[in-house]
Amino acid sequence: LWSLSVSVTRGAGGYKAGPDSERVRATLRLLNAVSHTEVIDGRNITVVYLYGRTADGQSMAVRTEPQPPWFQVVEPPDTMVAQLEAHAEVRATRPERLWVDGTERDCLRVEVWHPGKVPQLRDWLRASELVVLAADIPFHFRYIYDHDLGGCVTVEGEMLEKRGWSCPVIGAATLAPAETFTAPLRVLSFDVENSLLDRRLFCLCLTVHDGGELVAEQMLDGGEAGIIASFTAAIAKHDPDVITGYNIDGYDLPLLEERAKLHGMKLMLGRDGSEADQRSNRTWAVRGRVVADAWWNVKREIRPRQESLNAVAKQLLGREKHDVNPQQMD
């Protein structure tokens, strides 16, 4: 599907066909970075994927070259070095000289097989009263820091065939910072209406804006399973960079997940076909997309006296919702 070459003018932030049939080059404004687990040589390895958008509105994912998670230990005794080198989760170690607390000190760099093992090793070492450095950085951020990347990057590599993905994927051979630019984002906003008696879905309405221009609007109704299937299909079709709505973190997304489970379905909203994932702080993670709850942003930026959708719409847009009695919705 993506056998053409892609190249860009420096700083243009877009892509175009080139003469090479395999190599591609693109400049992206990054949306987010996500850790994916892949089986490489029979072992689960974490690989960072960068998601972004070009200046001319093409969303893409970048599979980076695998790199091991790592941290540093300040002046570990020889007995601890031996234990680390023999540990099943430790991939490799090497000595380093680092500037710590105003002086140069002997340290040990510890590379592990999986980032999920770093907290366990970190806590074990700290329990032995050792100083551990760089062990609190999420793995996908670690990749960005280690490669000195900013908000925009230029990537060169080959297009990868990824079944179930809603955007093209580049396998990065080289990755470098690029001149800053603003990319037009595709934003999907949705709202769910449901029964107050048994929580059944009545309908789901959505709109899609691309670069600020309305390009699609749709109302999904009928049976619950059909509404959920049509919604996930709409996400895959329109491939939004941002999913938004009013209180979707606290209501709409949890409700959709609840009703999907009731029907033996999964809420597949990620660009890689993965499920939406609710975090412990009530926010949601969708791979390759930004979930931006309008309620949280209004609360943080505007701090309105009243936080209801009706009050905020009136304050910002000069419009109010249709006056529907919730008790009569069923």
Named regions from a protein language model:
Residues 1-330:
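The two-metal-ion catalytic cores of nucleic-acid processing enzymes
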